Amino acid sequence: GLFDIIKKIAESF
């Protein structure tokens, strides 16, 4: 879902 995408981006930082 949308939160999964947010988590993926957060791991990039």
Swiss-Prot record:
The modification Phenylalanine amide is found at residue 13. Expressed by the skin dorsal glands. GO terms for biological process: defense response to bacterium. It comes from the Eukaryota. It is found in: Secreted. The keyword Cell membrane does not apply. Signal peptide: none annotated. Coiled coil: none annotated. One of its GO terms (cellular component) is extracellular region. Keywords: Amidation, Amphibian defense peptide, Antibiotic, Antimicrobial, Secreted. Belongs to the frog skin active peptide (FSAP) family. Aurein subfamily. Antimicrobial activity against B.cereus, L.lactis, L.innocua, M.luteus, P.multocida, S.aureus, S.epidermidis and S.uberis. Probably acts by disturbing membrane functions with its amphipathic structure. Shows anticancer activity. This is Aurein-1.2. It comes from Ranoidea raniformis (Southern bell frog). The lineage of its organism: Eukaryota, Metazoa, Chordata, Craniata, Vertebrata.
